[in-house]
From Swiss-Prot:
Record field: catalytic activity: N-(5-phospho-beta-D-ribosyl)anthranilate + diphosphate = 5-phospho-alpha-D-ribose 1-diphosphate + anthranilate
Lineage: Bacteria, Pseudomonadati, Pseudomonadota, Gammaproteobacteria, Candidatus Pseudothioglobaceae
Binding locations of anthranilate 2: 168
Source organism per UniProt: Ruthia magnifica subsp. Calyptogena magnifica
Name of the protein this chain belongs to: Anthranilate phosphoribosyltransferase
The protein's role, per its UniProt record: Catalyzes the transfer of the phosphoribosyl group of 5-phosphorylribose-1-pyrophosphate (PRPP) to anthranilate to yield N-(5'-phosphoribosyl)-anthranilate (PRA).
Length: 339
């Protein structure tokens, strides 16, 4: 199937098979299609609604083209990358979680990018902290093995994405590519906490990750619109564990945490985002610390360092009340230049 045939099919609201989607995506990612064809295809998919099989096939295609990072020990390997796109301008929560999870004994292969829809992307805040982002795949692997943290800058690893940059920019709408980033971690992490920008994606993405061979995953979207576990409202969860997907809702009160005001954790730039992160890692009580505890606790749970979400959050709070997470940030800044 070529992209023109695919467009004709999806505008009839007919899903593509995995094989059909793989063929079209491979043509797109290897430069065999025009910008107009890519735009028409992405809009058609968005209007029809991307199926689990279509997202699975697209992710498999991107994974086959990625510049990968090899990690020898994947037992407690996890990523906290989300889709972004919530438009709320909060500080970099998932990036902050990296240091808490590493302090708990996990290995975090953090996949991320510069700012797209937010005021500060994960790459921006890490750069503000002094982290060297220009690392080879070998250096990234060594950092993860040595200190439990590595950062994979998406444009460096997903070179084939250059073929869709202009069509996506011209369309200026959410497309399948908004969810593909977190699904295509270059280190092939078996465990993830993945935030998504819409509630309708929570359960389907859990099934996509099941199809991709993930081990333990939590996919989240909060009632107040975050692609994170919220400190201010209920959060919808789909959990993949032992090959089964279950759905449920959680609230900060479930973890004996007070509701927080999201206005307290908005960051207009990377520097202020870093300030909020450092204060929380130093144990300063408040909304930033509590939302980091919720999200890093989930990552601690899925990577096998706690046997329940509650215990994961408790472990995260204990770490935040010490200085070990901030020490991990300092370690990463230092090691990123010479490990």
């Amino acid at each position: 199937m070529n992209i023109q045939q695919a467009i004709k099919q999806i505008i009839k609201k007919q899903d593509l098979s995995e094989n059909e989607m793989h063929k079209v995506m491979n043509d797109i990612m290897t430069g065999k299609t025009t910008d107009a064809q890519i735009g028409g295809f992405l809009v058609g998919l968005a209007i029809k609604g991307e199926s689990v099989d279509e997202i699975t096939a697209a992710a498999k295609t991107m994974r086959s083209l990625v510049k990968s990072v090899t990690i020898k020990n994947t037992k407690h390997l996890v990523d906290t990358c989300g889709t972004g796109g919530d438009g709320l301008g909060l500080f970099n929560i998932s990036t902050a979680c990296t240091f808490v999870v590493a302090a708990a004994g996990g290995s975090v292969a953090k996949h991320g990018n510069s700012s797209i829809s937010s005021k500060s992307g994960s790459a921006d805040v890490l750069k503000a902290a002094g982290v060297n982002l220009d690392m080879s795949v070998e250096k990234i692997s060594k950092c993860i093995e040595k200190i439990g943290i590595g950062f994979m800058f998406a444009p460096f690893h997903h070179i084939a994405m250059k073929h869709v940059i202009e069509p996506r920019k011209d369309l200026a709408i959410k497309t399948i590519f908004n969810v593909l980033g977190p699904l295509t971690n270059p280190a092939k992490v078996p465990n993830q906490v993945m935030g998504v920008y819409a509630q309708s994606l929570v359960e389907p993405i859990a099934y996509v990750l099941k199809n991709l061979g993930s081990k333990h995953v939590i996919v989240v979207h909060s009632k107040d619109g975050l692609d994170e576990i919220s400190i201010a409202d209920d959060t919808f969860v789909a959990e993949l564990k032992n090959g089964q997907v279950s759905t449920y809702t959680i609230n900060p009160a479930d973890f004996s945490l007070p509701l927080g005001n999201l206005n307290d954790i908005k960051a207009n730039n990377a520097d202020y985002s870093l300030v909020l992160i450092q204060q929380a890692l130093d144990g300063k009580d408040g909304v930033a610390k509590n939302i980091i505890a919720l999200n890093s606790g989930a990552a601690i749970y899925v990577c096998g360092l706690a046997n329940s979400l509650q215990k994961g959050v408790n472990k995260a709070l204990n770490i935040l009340n010490s200085d070990v997470a901030h020490q991990k940030l300092d370690d990463f800044v230092r090691e990123s230049t010479d490990c």
